[in-house]
Amino acid sequence: MVLSPADKTNVKAAWDKVGGHAGDYGAEALERMFLSFPTTKTYFPHFSDLSHGSAQVKAHGKKVGDALNNAVGHMDDLPTALSALSDLHAHKLRVDPVNFKLLSHCLLVTLACHHPAEFTPAVHASLDKFLANVSTVLVSKYR
């Protein structure tokens, strides 16, 4: 899905609002995903604690946030920016591709909860397209 110039502007503006909270929002989205889609927990057998506030979930949330910061900064070349992450998830972790869509949805909900005034239909659509592109790149090495 091609991001229009307006989409890119919306994504950058929304992500600017996230600021230094990307890791916190990543952790919150993971917690939301674990609660809403419990089968996703199976990809984290090495985590001893998946509860709210878990240090392991916070650490992984920071990784998610950092990856999204990188993606926002490289919207015009996501395949290159996310290549190593795609390899990791496809070949080592073997995460079911549907889980990227689930996490994307949970991230949208998290952003809407924290920034309701800024989460307009246009921003929602742009973020959804952006996260769909990120998901597509992350599953590209599965083939």
Curated annotation (Swiss-Prot):
Source superkingdom: Eukaryota
Family in the record: Belongs to the globin family.
Protein name: Hemoglobin subunit alpha
Phosphothreonine: residues bearing it: T9, T110, T136
Gene Ontology BP terms: hydrogen peroxide catabolic process
InterPro entries the UniProt entry points to: Globin, Globin-like_sf, Globin/Proto, Hemoglobin_a-typ, Hemoglobin_oxygen_transport, Hemoglobin_pi
Globin domain ranges (all copies): 2-143
Cellular-component GO terms for this entry: blood microparticle; haptoglobin-hemoglobin complex; hemoglobin complex
Residues annotated with N6-acetyllysine modification: K17
